From Swiss-Prot:
Xref: Gene3D superfamilies: 3.30.190.20, 3.40.50.790
Domain of life: Bacteria
Protein's name in the database: Large ribosomal subunit protein uL1
GO biological process, one term: regulation of translation
PROSITE patterns according to UniProt: RIBOSOMAL_L1
Originating species: Treponema denticola (strain ATCC 35405 / DSM 14222 / CIP 103919 / JCM 8153 / KCTC 15104)
Pfam families the record matches: Ribosomal_L1
Membership in a protein family: Belongs to the universal ribosomal protein uL1 family.
Keywords: Repressor, Ribonucleoprotein, Ribosomal protein, RNA-binding, rRNA-binding, Translation regulation, tRNA-binding
Assembly notes: Part of the 50S ribosomal subunit.
InterPro entries the record matches: Ribosom_uL1_bac-type, Ribosomal_uL1, Ribosomal_uL1-like, Ribosomal_uL1/biogenesis, Ribosomal_uL1_3-a/b-sand, Ribosomal_uL1_CS
Amino acid sequence: MKHGKNYKNALAKYDSAASYELPKAVDIVKELKYAKFDETVEVHVSLTLGKGQSVRDTLVLPHQFRGEKKVLVFCTDDRVKEALDAGAAYAGSTEYIEKVKGGWLDFDIAVATPDMMKDVGRLGMVLGRRGLMPNPKTGTVTTDIASAINELKKGRVEFRADKGGVVHLPVGKVSMDSSKIVENVQALINETMRKKPADAKGDYIRSVSISSTMGPGVWVDYKVGE
């Protein structure tokens, strides 16, 4: 992959082979910013996963950095008021299933009660490819609608390892206070360790790096449990 002049200039400003303590790594990422927009800071956690092992879960980052999410709740008519009172942007059953089937996607997150999943599951071609399908593992298939909406609006995010065993997660904006980005990164590292498969072998976390949208990656000398 070819990189432009700005990227190469940023790369020359630090030792790209060195690992830095997390606060310093965050400061470097912010110093290397060169885009005119408020770049997103992303963390990349490389894991040692054996055959058949996977990591997928959710966490509420200590510091939210994105606008409020529009939540759609698939539920029976008798629970619509409960969902809307809890902060859902939309709630209902057949009406919204048909709207989504027709291509309507004016929401950021979908939640469903278990009794709705038989019908919601048929929306896989629309919701699945966009990562919007409700799933029990991410807490978006639940009978406790109010709690789910509350956590989602607080900034609960899903994280999962890709086929290469790497978890990628946005953790802030370069305009944020560095300490808030540090706390968000540390929260992911700690939660990833808590979800370590019981039969995982060797060094579970192989490496951690952070970068901004346009900038180069910075290796992190990470610590667990701080």
